[in-house]
């Protein structure tokens, strides 16, 4: 059962039939398909199989035991946040910023496939929003950056407009220290600063990384701090400090060394195909974030967080793999 597929019944849906409520949540599903899932026990009400004519009560829990993303509405301009049940895993929070741990399998921002369950909507719900209309709000709490859906770890957000502007400036200039843990196939022997050239294909979302400059490519820098080889698994646990912050930078860069992240399907290498297929997520975890020393004149809000260090409280799945 996936957490992302659970919903709480809001007060305004009290006494509604379960099929009517579910068909509103999943507007793109065929009625026949929904009733098939209901019949097969893939729709649960408070952890039990309901009858089709069951009437709902406030705070009833509905769980879908199938992938609901193809059936969700893609227009996210207006959203009832009562449908968002998941809670943030908070590392730090005050009146200006919030630092959270993102689990694997959840996207940071809404997209066509994840219009309801995403980290952004969880933040809005946490901050007391019951409804969200992006056309009517000048500012709303939001995250200043994102990590991949199948990467876990630290994400930082802003709760005020001033804090967001300063965070955006800090990220734009790569001032924050961002460290990751990763698990790669084979022995990794490329410690230290590595520079390469990066380009993203916006049509398919794939990035290309090469050692030498090529047309429209941008220079990237990655510092590989530590590597521990686990001989019985033929894998290496590595620590990475991200200097520039380009899309899929770590994942694509590792291919240059004929290594790849365990579980990475997008940037997989043929020699690891058979071993790689058994893993659902890529073995990458954002485990530490450190603020630099910030000047009060330039960062009147964030100066209070100068040199603050935040560490993830999640133990990534791949560390259990090598124990």
Swiss-Prot record:
Organism, as annotated: Mycoplasma genitalium (strain ATCC 33530 / DSM 19775 / NCTC 10195 / G37) (Mycoplasmoides genitalium)
Entry coiled-coil feature ranges: none
Pfam families xref list: PseudoU_synth_2 (PF00849)
Protein name in UniProt: Uncharacterized RNA pseudouridine synthase MG370
Domain S4 RNA-binding: 16-95
CDD domains to which the protein is assigned, alphabetical: PseudoU_synth_RluA_like (cd02869)
EC number: 5.4.99.-
Active-site annotation: 148
């Amino acid at each position: 059962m996936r957490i992302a597929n659970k919903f709480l019944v809001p007060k305004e849906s009290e006494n509604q039939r379960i099929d009517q409520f579910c068909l509103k949540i999943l507007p793109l599903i065929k009625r026949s398909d929904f009733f098939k899932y209901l019949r097969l026990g893939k729709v649960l009400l408070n952890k039990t199989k309901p009858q089709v004519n069951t009437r709902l009560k406030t705070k009833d829990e509905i769980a879908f035991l199938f992938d609901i993303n193809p059936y969700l509405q893609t227009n996210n301009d207006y959203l009832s946040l009562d449908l968002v049940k998941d809670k943030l895993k908070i590392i730090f929070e005050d009146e200006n910023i919030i630092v959270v741990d993102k689990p694997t399998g959840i996207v940071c921002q809404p997209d066509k496939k994840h219009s309801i369950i995403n980290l952004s909507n969880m933040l809005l719900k946490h901050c007391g929003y019951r409804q969200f209309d992006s056309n009517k709000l000048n500012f709303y709490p939001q995250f200043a950056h994102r990590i991949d859906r199948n990467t876990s770890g630290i994400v930082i957000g802003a709760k005020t407009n001033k804090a967001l502007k300063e965070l955006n400036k800090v990220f734009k200039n790569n001032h924050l220290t961002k460290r990751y843990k990763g698990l790669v196939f084979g022995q990794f022997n490329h410690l230290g600063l590595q520079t390469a050239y990066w380009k993203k294909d916006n049509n398919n979302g794939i990035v290309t990384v090469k050692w030498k400059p090529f047309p429209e490519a941008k220079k990237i820098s990655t510092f590989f701090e530590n590597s521990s080889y686990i001989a019985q698994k033929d894998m290496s646990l590595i620590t990475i400090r991200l200097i520039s912050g380009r899309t899929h930078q770590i994942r694509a860069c590792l291919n240059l060394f004929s290594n790849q992240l365990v579980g990475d399907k997008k940037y997989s290498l043929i020699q690891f195909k058979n071993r790689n297929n058994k893993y659902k997520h890529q073995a990458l975890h954002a485990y530490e974030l450190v603020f630099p020393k910030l000047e009060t004149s330039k960062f009147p809000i964030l100066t209070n967080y100068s040199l603050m260090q935040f560490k993830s409280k999640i133990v990534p799945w791949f560390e259990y793999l090598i124990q």
